[in-house]
Amino acid sequence: MPRFDSTEHVRWLGNHMQTVLEYGQHAYIHGGFGYIRSDGSVDDTKPVELDLTARSTYIYAIASLLGIPGSLRRCEHGIQSISNAFKDPNYDGWFSLIEPIQEHQKLTNAPGIPAGTEGNRKSSRAMSYLLEAAAAASLTHVSSAKELLKQAITVEEKYFWNEEVGRVNETFKRDFSEMENYHGMSSNLHAVSAFLSVANATQDKKWIERAARIVSFAMEQARNNNWRVPEHFDGDWNLDRNYNVGTPADPRRPYGINVGHNFGWSRRIVQVAAALQKNGLEPPQDYLQVAREIFDRTAADSWCKDGHSGISFTVDYHGKPLMRQRFTWVLTEALQAVVSLAFALREQGATAEELEPYFELYYRWWDYLEGYVIHADGYWVGELNANNLPDDTVWPGAPDIYHSVSVLLTPRLPNAPSAAAAIAQGNLDHPLSAEHHKALWE
């Protein structure tokens, strides 16, 4: 079986990443980054999302650190858009969704207008992407990123991080006067990634410790639920197994177990453990066992379960597939998890023979993406039906490039520090120590 670091595979990863980055340029609009249609054009009539803008900003910060021309100005555009168009002029924080920028706003840099109910709420998920973008951009030559990161940390600590429970709050009314009576593991998953990025940008270990507290709760939930991490909780953090039972196709809060997020938890556990160890702190003794159990359970629940290749979007609490749509982001989370697990297992002494099942899954999943998802121009199909035909039932149009670029980079980077810091420190294509890297392939 080929290795993660085979010369031709790494060359393919790098070449296609540059193609994807070129494709992602289509998302550039006034006020941030927008939706790309399936034909590659940007839809500038839709409201502009903080999520998408921050994610694209993060990716172009990464590309800037890689030295890819044109990326710095796109990163700077994202930071300026977040700082101006999305910044709430009357209350703390940033709008989650704004109306398309009008001509007079382009000339004056006036704040954006929040779009609908969602736009008037302050979201932990969006804050996590903002933190990740600002943290990565602060390592580039975008000078205003450091100030944005400072402001974002203040808002995160004031409203979203809950020190008492060791997790993040979900959403608030615009003025932060009322918090949603719901807690989700999705927001906490994204918070882990954001906190690790902030820790690397600020050199403040408390963010790693906060990420570890979130991961500890996810591990506890996995142990108590047959190695599945449930998604939905009420305002007092009681598990709500019936949340959205009538809307299994909800794109953000589907009923049941979210397969992509469970693969994500498997990876975040080993990333946090690596960050703790790198900073002289002790990870939980069973972190690797729990990460493997979650990964193995999720793969068994979701991969090739209905006579066709592909990974189901959701399963019920017993592992039966529910939403059988295939979302590309789910498979990218699976691929990143298999890489992170293999690296972590090698650091613990696993042999190449013991890692062979992970190598096999890795290349089978890349073959699936190449066969059904990846186009030569950098477009990745975002959604397929159960027969692996392109679909737009849940997510019309093309996905942004956050997940595609991330999965193309993961095999080339260590589990810690986070991607931007690892690249800035010269760790690209050095994911393991020299000793473990050599031993991995012997």
In which residue ranges do the predicted regions lie?
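Glycan-recognition and catalytic cores of secretory/periplasmic carbohydrate-active enzymes
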Residues: 1-442
